């Protein structure tokens, strides 16, 4: 079953699903802006198109991830994103 989610006044939208090949996940698009997300469990984020400038927990330097690149976020933490152009992503819940 698909589950639609909307965050930050509609600037981030995602569709959650469960797949036998990758497990529980969501795909979505982020409009330009700055966002802070909290995690309940570890997440693996793959940039599908565009780019995300990311500040991960415990780090002091922002890093840019582009299409095809992956980063991991620990559970029970926050991470910060800067988005300069509409960017799509795949989030796997680990």
From Swiss-Prot:
Native organism taxonomy: Bacteria, Pseudomonadati, Pseudomonadota, Gammaproteobacteria, Enterobacterales
General function of this protein: Catalyzes the phosphorolysis of diverse nucleosides, yielding D-ribose 1-phosphate and the respective free bases. Can use uridine, adenosine, guanosine, cytidine, thymidine, inosine and xanthosine as substrates. Also catalyzes the reverse reactions.
Protein name as catalogued: Pyrimidine/purine nucleoside phosphorylase
Family annotation (Pfam families): Ppnp
The protein's Enzyme Commission number: 2.4.2.1, 2.4.2.2
GO MF annotations in UniProt: guanosine phosphorylase activity; purine-nucleoside phosphorylase activity; thymidine phosphorylase activity; uridine phosphorylase activity
Gene Ontology, cellular component aspect: cytosol
Membership in a protein family: Belongs to the nucleoside phosphorylase PpnP family.
Cystine bridges: none
Keyword Transferase among record annotations: yes
